[in-house]
Design a protein with these regions (language model features):
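C-terminal helix-rich "cap/oligomerization" subdomain common to oxidoreductases
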Residues: 1, 62-64, 287-327
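N-terminal Rossmann-like dinucleotide-binding module
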Residues: 1-44, 172
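Beta-loop-alpha module in the N-terminal Rossmann-like domain of NAD(P)-dependent dehydrogenases
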Residues: 17, 46-105
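Hydrophobic residues in well-ordered beta-strands that form the structural core
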Residues: 88, 113-115, 237
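A contiguous active-site-proximal alpha/beta segment in oxidoreductase catalytic domains
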Residues: 93-155
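C-terminal glycine/acidic-rich active-site capping loop/insertion
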Residues: 118, 232-303, 325-327
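Rossmann-like dinucleotide-binding domain that binds NAD(P)(H)
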Residues: 152-221, 227, 303
Length: 327
């Protein structure tokens, strides 16, 4: 018997959810909802409702919540009370307090509560994590991320840290399999909005790994890089192209003095890996489905989403206070 799924929120991300949800084996997208209608044509003949109550009344087992961040708590709590499994877009909520209420509601109801931290499902990062787990990099020393691009007019209710930086917070802790212990950050605002447009942050994980993150939506150049440096070299994942490259530590002496000034005293092999590249959004939906069926727990839980939001708020606190924040 198929899982009856619904979608609330038909904006820029919601339309992509609608497309992918139609393709997930073992599920059936039965209805969608958005109080502002369906300007992207995502419903495509499905019942289109205005409220979450109407969506619940139609009969759904699971719902993807792609409404603005400020509405995550209200919509999520109504779905939890109705016994509906939910995957909410990231960040989990507008603030840690609201996120905690969502975690508590879904835990108490025994429901799957997931958060759409889609970067975990990027094939380049999944390959990287597998190779790190197998010991190919040895001990990890540092994780650095760069996430830059043009200003997205669609974002209005949160700043760049909660909208984009949460990607890097989540994937960093996930790759290292260690939570953040300390952060220090600086922010900059260029727009007339009340939120930050740029952040530069450093951190330390509980494992001792150091991190640094550059995130902004002020750059004309789109960049999505994760660099993990360890005792045997460095992995570089480009999540725009889903490419993974390994830079091996130098083993061959550089005899050309002028070249060694730029590249160092030795060189190692550089390998770009070939692997299957599934669409991250589809892989994310399959993980949500499998969690509902009890087959595996590869989805990002609301508790993990809450941890990520707590780190994001700690970065903002650090930027405001000018001091490091310990978690």
């Amino acid at each position: 018997m198929s899982i009856r799924t619904g979608l609330i929120g038909l904006g820029m991300m919601g339309r992509h959810h609608a497309r992918v949800m139609r393709s997930i084996e073992g599920t059936e997208l039965v209805a969608v909802a958005d109080p502002f209608g369906d300007k992207h044509g995502a419903a495509a003949g499905l019942p289109l409702f205005q409220t979450v109550e109407e969506l619940i009344a139609h009969g759904v087992d699971a719902v993807v919540c792609a409404v603005p961040t400020g509405l995550h708590e209200e919509v999520g709590l109504k779905l939890a009370a109705a016994g509906v499994h939910v995957m909410v877009e990231k960040p989990i909520a507008e603030n840690v307090e609201a996120g905690q209420r969502l975690v508590d509601a879904f835990d108490s109801a025994g429901l799957v509560g997931a958060v759409g931290h889609i970067e975990r499902f990027n094939p380049a990062l999944q390959q990287m994590r597998k190779r790190i787990e197998s010991g190919e990099l040895g001990d990890i020393y540092q994780i650095a991320t760069r996430r830059q691009g043009p200003f997205p007019a669609r974002i209005a209710d949160v700043g760049v840290v909660k909208d984009l930086g949460t990607h890097d917070i989540d994937l960093t802790a996930w790759i290292a399999q260690s939570p953040f212990a300390e952060v220090n950050a600086k922010t900059f605002t260029a727009s007339e909005r009340p939120h930050e447009d740029m952040i530069v942050a450093t951190g330390r994980l509980a494992s001792g790994v150091i991190t640094n993150h550059i995130v902004n939506w002020l750059s004309p150049m789109k960049e999505r890089l994760t660099i993990v440096t360890g005792e045997r070299g460095a992995f570089v994942a480009d999540t725009v192209t889903a490419d993974l490259t390994f830079y091996e530590n130098g083993s061959v002496p550089t005899e050309w003095d002028a070249l060694s000034a730029f590249r160092g005293v030795s060189e190692g092999n550089v390998t770009r890996y070939a692997f299957a590249k599934a669409e991250p959004l589809k892989t994310e939906h399959e993980a949500f489905r499998d969690g509902i069926l009890g087959n595996r727990n590869a989805y990002v839980s609301m508790r993990e989403g809450l941890d990520t939001l707590r780190v994001a708020e700690s970065m903002l606190e650090s930027a405001d206070s000018g001091s490091s924040v310990h978690l």
